[in-house]
């Protein structure tokens, strides 16, 4: 039988429930258990692929091409696993599947209803995802009381009834600190637990999210009104880095509680590598100023995995990347702002659409001309090709056909397999692809192997008809798609560090396993500083 830890949220969203879930996973992994994690998003979208990054943040791409919630990135980084697209369940997926089954006659003439048909489909997916694992974490997105959560809470209630002692319910809720009196206000949490109990779910444990460590009297009050023992109330307060949360919850006894409650093997947790990473992350010797140029920089969560990948690489080098967010629209208005920033490295970020792209191209030109270590990712690589075509080859008006369909020099164009696609969602080049590294290149020295596997999310590619001109002018293609001829990595010899990738290296970065292109960027920046 599967063992499930079902996590709900109360009071308000966006308080770090996903980090708490990932931390629980890390705690169990430290005991040698195999752990899976599922994120439920109650929105009607089938997946996150078409959602506005300002509203939703980053779209995290799984190895099998799922466009998922950014919490799956937290899960992968904390658990050091690769998750599937089946690990992100949405209302859209559930309703679509139920309707398709009804159209095929699979319900044999029944009146299809929320209960049992929708809830059965939810349960089926959760149980299916839990197969082969010691424990599966299930995070129900949103806040208890949201209308769209109801079928998922009902499915969770039914699973608790059907699986009994093999299900643990944990409720995560924010407790605000009233600064005028210095008092924690537990009433909103009490109400959220009361609301959860209305749906037939009594939490076995509560994780209190708070700005500062919560006091003993507040814990007593929560225990009384939430009907949870004091020893099953834990506190995830604000800390300098999210990677410290597993150790805080471990010290409070959450690991031992879950081991007892789910009758799991009792083993001493092993955190040696995690603690070593934390010590380097928290007290670095060096600082590196990294310019992050993109069009969604007002919401850094739109680039969350890149931010984390830079942290991982920095910790490996005993350095802290200090991120300078550069709005490419502002660069278009005033390119001179780049000179005033005194950057040690520049990353040009992924994106879509025309807005702000000339500012991104200017950032690339600045990095190339001023010999500043540079990394371009996905759209950033395509724009690096455009910049080189315009300013080195002298191809006036060179562009991507995504940005200018009438460009006289389409150095980046729609990939052949995308030209007949007329559906927006789930139709890009997605997921893992193998990339062959060209020997004797910067990419070869970074990766140290001839073939790598990286995750993708794009529609456009470098136009190979311009390749002879690029090669003659000194641009090197150092990585190719293995199954078809497609440019995956470009670089500029003679520059301290200038490399760009069509793939997204950030999605496979882990705290103890930073990705080579991020390591190389920060190494080059450190070398230049010295």
UniProtKB/Swiss-Prot annotation:
| Pathways involved | Pyrimidine metabolism; CTP biosynthesis via de novo pathway; CTP from UDP: step 2/2
UniProt-annotated stretches for the region Amidoligase domain? 1-264
What is the protein's given name?
A: CTP synthase
Q: Could you tell me what reaction this enzyme catalyses?
A: UTP + L-glutamine + ATP + H2O = CTP + L-glutamate + ADP + phosphate + 2 H(+); L-glutamine + H2O = L-glutamate + NH4(+); UTP + NH4(+) + ATP = CTP + ADP + phosphate + 2 H(+)
Q: Does the keyword Magnesium apply?
A: yes
Active site (catalytic residues): 378 (nucleophile), 504, 506
Read off the HAMAP family from this record. Answer: PyrG (MF_01227)
Which residues are involved in binding UTP?
Answer: 13, 185-190, 221
Q: Which GO terms describe its biological process?
A: 'de novo' CTP biosynthetic process; CTP biosynthetic process; pyrimidine nucleobase biosynthetic process
Instruction: State which gene encodes it.
Output: pyrG
Residue ranges of domain Glutamine amidotransferase type-1 in the record: 289-530
Residues the record lists as binding ATP: 14-19, 71
Q: Which residues bind L-glutamine?
A: 54, 351, 379-382, 402, 459
Q: What else is known?
A: CTPSs have evolved a hybrid strategy for distinguishing between UTP and CTP. The overlapping regions of the product feedback inhibitory and substrate sites recognize a common feature in both compounds, the triphosphate moiety. To differentiate isosteric substrate and product pyrimidine rings, an additional pocket far from the expected kinase/ligase catalytic site, specifically recognizes the cytosine and ribose portions of the product inhibitor.
Q: List the disulfide bonds.
A: none
Q: Which family does it belong to?
A: Belongs to the CTP synthase family.
């Amino acid at each position: 039988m599967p063992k499930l830890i079902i996590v709900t949220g109360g009071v308000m969203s966006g308080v770090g429930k996903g980090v708490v879930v990932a931390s629980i996973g890390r705690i169990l992994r430290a005991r040698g258990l195999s752990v899976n994690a599922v994120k439920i998003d109650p929105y009607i979208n089938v997946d996150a692929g078409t959602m506005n990054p300002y509203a939703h943040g980053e779209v995290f791409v799984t190895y099998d091409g799922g466009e998922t919630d950014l919490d799956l990135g937290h899960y992968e980084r904390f658990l050091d696993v690769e998750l599937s697209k089946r690990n992100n369940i949405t209302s859209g997926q559930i309703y679509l599947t139920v309707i398709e089954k009804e159209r095929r006659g699979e319900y044999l003439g029944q009146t299809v209803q929320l209960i049992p048909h929708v809830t059965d489909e939810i349960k089926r997916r959760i149980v299916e995802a839990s197969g082969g694992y010691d424990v599966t974490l299930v995070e129900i997105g949103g806040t208890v009381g949201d209308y769209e959560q109801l079928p998922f809470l009902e499915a969770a209630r039914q699973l608790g009834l059907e699986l009994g002692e093999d299900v643990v319910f944990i409720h995560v809720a924010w407790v605000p600190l009233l600064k005028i009196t210095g008092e924690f206000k537990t009433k909103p949490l009490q109400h959220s637990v009361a609301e959860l109990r209305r749906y037939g779910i009594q939490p076995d444990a509560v994780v209190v999210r708070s700005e500062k460590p919560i006091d003993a009297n507040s814990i007593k009050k929560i225990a009384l009104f939430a009907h949870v023992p004091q020893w099953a109330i834990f506190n995830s307060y604000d800390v300098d880095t999210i990677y410290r949360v597993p150790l805080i919850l471990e010290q409070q006894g959450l690991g031992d509680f879950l081991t007892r409650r789910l009758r799991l093997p009792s083993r001493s947790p092993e955190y040696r590598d995690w603690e070593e990473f934390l010590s380097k992350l928290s007290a670095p010797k060096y600082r590196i100023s990294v310019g992050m140029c993109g069009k969604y920089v007002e919401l850094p969560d739109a680039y969350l995995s890149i931010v984390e990948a830079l942290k991982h690489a920095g910790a490996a080098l005993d350095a802290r990347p200090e991120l300078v967010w550069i709005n490419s629209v502002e660069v278009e208005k005033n390119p001179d702002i780049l000179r005033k920033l005194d950057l040690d490295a520049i990353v040009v970020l992924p994106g879509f659409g025309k807005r702000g792209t000339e500012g991104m191209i200017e950032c690339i030109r600045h990095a190339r001309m001023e010999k500043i270590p540079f990394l371009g990712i996905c759209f950033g690589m395509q724009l690096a090709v455009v910049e080189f075509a315009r300013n080195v080859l002298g191809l006036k008006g060179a562009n991507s056909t995504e940005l200018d369909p009438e460009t006289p020099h389409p150095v980046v164009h729609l990939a052949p397999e995308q030209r007949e696609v007329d559906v927006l969602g789930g139709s890009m080049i997605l997921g893992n692809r193998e990339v062959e590294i060209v020997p004797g290149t910067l990419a070869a020295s970074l990766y140290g192997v001839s073939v790598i596997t990286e995750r993708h999310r794009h529609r456009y590619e470098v136009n190979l008809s311009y390749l002879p001109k690029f090669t003659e002018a000194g641009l090197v293609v150092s990585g190719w798609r293995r199954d078809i001829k497609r440019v995956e990595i470009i670089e500029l010899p003679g520059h301290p560090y200038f490399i760009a990738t069509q793939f997204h290296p950030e999605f496979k970065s882990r705290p103890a396993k930073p990705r080579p292109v991020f390591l190389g960027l920060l190494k080059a920046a450190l070398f230049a500083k010295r």
